[in-house]
Amino acid sequence: MHDKKSPMANSHYLKNLKQQFRNKNLIETTIHLVKCNDHDSLAFLARTYGVPPQLRHVVWPILLKYHPMCISPNITSNTISWDPITNDFILNDPFLKSKAPTDKQDKSDDENILPYDIESIILHDLKKYFHSRSNPAGSSSNANTTNIATPTPVSSSDASTISSMEVLSPSLDYEFQIIETLKNAIVKFLLKWSKIFKYESGLAWIALGLAEWYPIYPYETMSPFNETHSFYEVEDYVVLSGRKHALLSTNNGNNGNSNSSSNNTNNNNTNITSGMHNLSINTNTSLHNSPYISHTLSYLYKEYPLPFELRSKLPTKPIFSFSALFERLALVILHCPDTILAHKQLKNDSNASSSSKANSNFNTNYFPIISGGDLSFQTQVFFKVFSSILPELYQPLTEESSLQPSSSRNSWIYWWLKCSGAKALQRQDRGRVWDLLLGWRPKPNMDTINFFLNYNDKKMDHLYHDTPQCDNEQYWMKDWIALYNNDPFWFPDLDSMALGSKKFPYDYSVFKELILRNRYGGTQSKAQKDNTVPSPGSDSNDKSELKLPFSSIDPHMQLIFIFIAILQFNEFKLLEFEEAEIPEFLNNVPLLTKFDDSSYRKLYENTESSITSLPSSPTTSTMASLQSSSNSSAHISNYHMLIEVGNDAKASHCFDDLLNMAGDIWRKWLWRELEESSL
């Protein structure tokens, strides 16, 4: 007698099936785009679908190479601040409480050399990743020794058996070299930027977060980085696998204990570093008979398998050293527009205006919810949205000590907002959040770029394109763009407005137009229509030209609404917590994207089944089935849309659902603000 599956089970199976189709097609498309260096399309996929975890070490350097905030950087300063009373800059006390300055320190500052005690503090913070928590109770492992996963010879016939790894204790020297390399990357950043940014522990955790996806070479200080060196020609590359991964072992006698602990990532905080040894594409390799065994990324490919045929298409030479890539990532995470310049521009425009009301309200007109503000503004918006969207949770949280930390570095708000989820989010969730940051792109014209980067004096629009640049782009990108023909943070008519133009130079001028266009029963005048630009997702008579959708708002503002969505997703759980449990939860958020993570881990299992037998590119039927099941809010046309506020249903363990929830919160909250404003 055949067992009948319940409708719920069938629905779950179909969802997994569609997700596997989509993820496999996404991996193949991403590899194709990497091969032809189509960074515009890669950025689009990163900010909408996310970069497959198997490919972040290849895609992230490309995204950061062309990121506007890296080409024209400006970061928040923790050494100086603007005093509106004296109308001048003042020196801040560093977040790091150091000893009274000595002659040696004063001299080192003048020579742009870091104070003598900074490196020891950096090392102390880095070691917390490896040793801050002991092994699970009952473990015989030394709590002060990390574990390294050493690959053994395997067959390449099955991606799931790419590296059978036995956990061994590395030498202390090897671990020291790993930490030393991370420290040197931070030191290089500080030597370059220390005039405006002093060391904070967030830098250590940003470096560690990058090292969980991008390989580092522990002996970089002894053997300088060379772009001609392949990842696969140099031994001893390392990728960190996260603080909370359980011990992996296929051959030791404690396998049962390891497996049981692996089911609870919150209880096992032992770090595993993946020893990334010689990966060769030479069929005469002396290490293994396999022509292409990835030991350089052995742990990563064990977690997230990638078949031999696809691995062989990946580039082998790194674009950046780890320290260079870390600097670029830090520039994006710590980015801040020039708020002083923005205030001056608003004041000058107000003085030039004949309206005394405009002159008196120029300060209230500065509300850069679209173009982005500094950390203080982001924090203000976060709590403003929090209190508006989740009042039941906001009130008890504001009464708890979790919002009154003794140090900003110990606060979950610090890790969430200033460090973009470093330390507080799980490795998988943080990787997906950073995909969004690194994939952010404004429309490729200087008016729009300067709207977001108001300090910019570089011409860079020629680096970006609004159409895919790969050959046969229709074949690879058409269906993906059809699934997400709008930015997740779209707002009615926002995409059709020429941001940064003379008509819309500031956020408040955009808000005025949005109110005018989206009033219920309102109509769009001819003058309004003349000041619109075509929407990427709109139908055009020219069907041969495929347009990429671009980002609608600043990426750090996007993160605010993603974090609010995380709170909404965990609202009932947080309401039930004891006071002491709340900050622990917020500083160590459990894995949010279980469904996504499981799908990528099991993507190439049962390779003989029909599920995994995909064509070499996305098919119309496959992508059509995905399109029909995708969230409808992402597909609505941009033309004069009136907001329809629906229910914010609790999301499943999928980042797409979380992203859609964040977009809904953004639209709901902003419309409330616009309706209540006096613009």
Swiss-Prot record:
What InterPro entries does the entry give? Rab-GAP-TBC_dom, Rab-GAP_TBC_sf
Per the record, the domain of life is Eukaryota
Biased composition regions of type Low complexity, renumbered to the chain: 135-153
Per the record, which residues fall in region Disordered? Answer: 135-159, 250-271, 524-544
Is Kinase found in the keyword set? no
Which segments constitute the Rab-GAP TBC domain?
50-441
* Chief location bin: cytoplasm
Query: What's any one GO cellular component for it?
Result: cytoplasm
For this UniProt record, give its keywords in alphabetical order, as a comma-separated list: Cytoplasm
Q: Does the keyword Cytoplasm apply?
A: yes
Cellular location(s): Cytoplasm
Ranges annotated as biased composition (Polar residues): 524-539
Recorded family membership: Belongs to the OCA5 family.
Q: What does this protein do?
A: Required for replication of brome mosaic virus (BMV), a positive-strand RNA virus.
The name this protein goes by in its record? Oxidant-induced cell-cycle arrest protein 5
Q: Which organism is it from?
A: Saccharomyces cerevisiae (strain Lalvin EC1118 / Prise de mousse) (Baker's yeast)
